Amino acid sequence: MTETDEGAPVNHSATMWAVVGVPPVCGGQPGDSGVVAGTSRALVDAAIIAPVTTLTRDEPAQYDRYEFEGPRRRARRERAERRAAQACAIAIEEARREAKHRIHRQMSSEANSPKPVARGVVRGLKTLFATVMFSIAGFGLGLALYVTPAMSVRNIVVTGIETVTREEVLDAAGVQLGTPLLQINTNQVADQVAAIRRVASARAQRQYPSALRITIVERVPVVVKDFPDGPHLFDCDGVDFATAPPPPALPYIDVGHPGPIDPATKAALVVLLALRPEVVSQVARIAAPSVSSITLILTDGRAVIWGSTDRAEEKAEKLAALLTQPGRTYDVSSPDLPTVK
């Protein structure tokens, strides 16, 4: 205990604790920065060997008592304060070291211990493994079916033929018996069969375990035209698909250059397809020198002036009604004013 320049006594114990950042008697106060986190309270309490009282200016009684204490008592008190401060500092240092070692051991144990694998990762790996195995199995099965004769062609079924022969279809398809079904390109087979003149369309299908089915649609003659090599049959698209005697009651077509891209041919076919069935059976010839000048000749010699293909459905309906009336020439080129002569 000493005096300042103003004569006020100074508590050396309080001054020393202010320097080291620890409150007197190692008790600490809220907000003191000197106490290390994790300090063992038991160690600090054990380090206190004697209670120390802090002297302030607000305690005159204590001030008077300390002012008149003897030198021996003051020396003993100061030694006790130093011993208490030393013990508290040792306790704080030991607590700090213990906390540091505990944190180090915890970090080491966490680093050395293997981390458990998440359940989601395990499920994902299992799903991936199963997918890969199924893919490999499916690929192996497909490869086996592609090369093995276990599922090969043993029978070829052909449907839809009337005038086209089975041999023509098989020759065009080019499929050999014993060929694995998976090696057959069905689109290519259908295209090859459709190349036959009398075939309008074709379809090839695999029928497991050992059959190939080919379905065709033959062309149907709609009109016929005479050529030097004989009569040629044309279907509804204007395709010349056969040179053969025409079926009975098939009308002849008179155009310059019949074909699927000829405008006059297409116009004449539009008219024939618009006629009622009972009228079509009476048509012997259809002439189309141009798309706007179409004429029908009936089997009994009567003539029908049709005109262009405009309003073909209306003209066909009016013509069916007019043919019930006597006459030699029927004009439906203007369906609003049909006439009979």
Swiss-Prot record:
Metal-binding found in the keyword field: no
Topological domain spans for side Cytoplasmic: 1-126
Domain POTRA: residue ranges: 151-219
Coiled coil region boundaries: none
Keywords linked to the UniProt accession: Cell cycle, Cell division, Cell membrane, Membrane, Transmembrane, Transmembrane helix
Its job: Essential cell division protein.
Membrane topology term: Single-pass type II membrane protein
Upper lineage: Bacteria, Bacillati, Actinomycetota, Actinomycetes, Mycobacteriales
Extracellular side: 148-341
Subcellular location field: Cell membrane
Descriptive protein name: Cell division protein FtsQ
Source organism superkingdom: Bacteria
